[in-house]
Amino acid sequence: LDKTATGSELFNFIATMIKEIITEGEHYYLGHTFSFPFTQTNIDEAYLIEWTKEFKTKAVEGQNVTALLVTALNKLGIFNVEPVAVINDTVATFLAAAYTNNNVIIGSICGTGHNTACLIGDTIFNLESGNFSKIPLNKYDEQFDLLTEKPKKQLLEKLSAGRYLGEVVRTV
């Protein structure tokens, strides 16, 4: 499965992986992370705003990713997996740390992508900090950025995350 797969292919792949680990006759409540910018309208609803990390999967932007997953699960005859929550990975990291330390105020991911969540008052905010773009670029950064799917977007992520670092070095 590559990053240009259709939305159906992507969620069918995820559903197939889930099918491999579940037991028929048992009921599963599923909490899942989605590591892309989304608008959350309910604990189990997340509408993809736009792809990052060079994903090009069609027919997903603007869609409820949990509903797409349920459709894929049902297509495979899987009715015993019930998605009950979807969360951004930085928020999940924040909550995991805060579970044992109530002084935590930041959750951060620097892996394939880059993002940060922070606590302001009683609310955890997903900052989508990988999209921070007011940073100085050298000529190599500028050359590399022009080779990406979305130039001038996700600059901090492009200059710091694992998805891009090898390619940055290769183009220098």
What is each PLM-predicted segment?
Residues L1, E20, L30, Q40, ...:
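Gly/Thr-rich phosphate-binding beta-strand-loop-beta motif of the actin/hexokinase/Hsp70
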Residues L1-A15, F38-Y99, N103-I106, T123-P136:
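Glycine-rich phosphate-binding loop and adjoining helix at the ATP-binding site
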Residues F11-H27:
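Short amphipathic alpha-helices and their capping/turn segments at secondary-structure boundaries
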Residues T16, E20, T71, K75, ...:
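Ordered, helix-dominated protein-protein interaction surfaces in large eukaryotic regulatory proteins
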Residues G25-S35, V84:
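Short glycine-rich phosphate-binding loop at a beta-alpha junction
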Residues E26-Y28, N80, N88, C110-T112:
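Short, basic and Ser/Thr-rich N-terminal targeting/leader segments
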Residues F94, A98-C110, H114-V172:
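Active-site core segments that coordinate phosphate-bearing ligands/cofactors
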